[in-house]
């Protein structure tokens, strides 16, 4: 179920504040965040945000196509290592 149309998209206040300060000063630093549920705003385009995947921070460069999506959509939380083949069944 999607968010109510009466409400604005969610973005962590501290994250948005850091982005707006960097836009005002012209800096392009990597910002660490644990807020995977924050929506990407147009002000964030061109910045790199390190999103936490549960183990480490993964840097994500934000482009125009990502606006409206959540930060967590671009960082995987699970690692797929493949299925382990059974060695005894291969001998037959």
From Swiss-Prot:
Signal peptide start and end residues: none
GO biological process: ribosomal small subunit assembly; translation
Gene Ontology cellular-component annotations: cytoplasm; small ribosomal subunit
Keyword rRNA-binding in annotation: yes
Alphabetically ordered keywords of this record: Ribonucleoprotein, Ribosomal protein, RNA-binding, rRNA-binding
Alphabetized InterPro entries for the sequence: Ribosomal_uS19, Ribosomal_uS19_bac-type, Ribosomal_uS19_CS, Ribosomal_uS19_SF
Domain of life: Bacteria
GO function terms (MF aspect): rRNA binding; structural constituent of ribosome
Function: Protein S19 forms a complex with S13 that binds strongly to the 16S ribosomal RNA.
Family: Belongs to the universal ribosomal protein uS19 family.
PANTHER family, sorted: RIBOSOMAL PROTEIN S19P FAMILY MEMBER, SMALL RIBOSOMAL SUBUNIT PROTEIN US19M
Name under which the protein is recorded: Small ribosomal subunit protein uS19
Protein source organism: Clostridium botulinum (strain Eklund 17B / Type B)
């Amino acid at each position: 179920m999607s968010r109510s149309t009466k409400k604005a998209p969610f973005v962590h206040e501290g994250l948005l504040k850091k982005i707006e300060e960097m836009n005002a000063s012209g800096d392009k630093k990597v910002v660490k965040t644990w807020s995977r549920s924050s929506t990407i705003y147009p002000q964030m385009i061109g910045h790199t945000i390190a999103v936490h995947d549960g183990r480490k921070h993964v840097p994500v460069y934000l482009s125009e196509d990502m606006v409206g999506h959540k930060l967590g959509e671009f960082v995987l939380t699970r690692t797929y290592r493949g299925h382990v083949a059974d060695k005894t069944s291969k001998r037959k």
